[in-house]
Amino acid sequence: MAEGEITTFTALTERFGLPLGNYKKPKLLYCSNGGHFLRILPDGKVDGTRDRSDQHIQLQLSAEDVGEVYIKSTASGQYLAMDTNGLLYGSQLPGEECLFLERLEENHYNTYISKKHADKNWFVGLKKNGNSKLGPRTHYGQKAILFLPLPVSAD
């Protein structure tokens, strides 16, 4: 490797045609705004909870393409989705409203922008009280859009 040359894992994935697949183990998405974990309930409601033992906060992230992910609750089987009004909800089937652009920020938190509404910069976000935040009310720089992927087990 030449001096100053940088290789990333995504570049290697593309170069060698490796499958994107899923991120193997379920994760918890911890929101720095209010200390909530993103939760997708069986009835399709999306919110946050501080209860680390809640089974609906275990999320499986699977890559559709480089930087594009589906987020699915392992307990409810619902996919995180954002409708045309920017409301977060759980969907039974993966579709275009369920794809999110995942970005690692400089502060080591991740942000998730709805791919369908990427031109509007609508992020996944949680309010301090744990309610989901409407896409049009989110913007870059808010704590509400920052999520830290954590392992399910605390050990």
From Swiss-Prot:
PROSITE patterns from the UniProt entry: HBGF_FGF (PS00247)
GO MF annotation, one: heparin binding
Residues reported in the UniProt entry to bind heparin: 33
Keywords: Angiogenesis, Cytoplasm, Developmental protein, Differentiation, Growth factor, Heparin-binding, Mitogen, Nucleus, Secreted
GO BP terms, alphabetized: angiogenesis; branch elongation involved in ureteric bud branching; epicardial cell to mesenchymal cell transition; fibroblast growth factor receptor signaling pathway; mesonephric epithelium development; neurogenesis; positive regulation of angiogenesis; positive regulation of cell division
Claim: Cytoplasm is one of the keywords in the record: yes
GO cellular component: cell cortex; cytoplasm; cytosol; extracellular region; extracellular space; nucleus
Propeptide cleavage-removed residue intervals: 1-15
Heparin-binding, as annotated region: 127-143
InterPro entries attached to this UniProt entry: Fibroblast_GF_fam, IL1/FGF
Any Pfam family the entry gives: FGF
Protein family membership: Belongs to the heparin-binding growth factors family.
PANTHER family: FIBROBLAST GROWTH FACTOR
Primary role: Plays an important role in the regulation of cell survival, cell division, angiogenesis, cell differentiation and cell migration. Functions as a potent mitogen in vitro. Acts as a ligand for FGFR1 and integrins. Binds to FGFR1 in the presence of heparin leading to FGFR1 dimerization and activation via sequential autophosphorylation on tyrosine residues which act as docking sites for interacting proteins, leading to the activation of several signaling cascades. Binds to integrins.
Protein name as catalogued: Fibroblast growth factor 1
Gene name of the record: FGF1
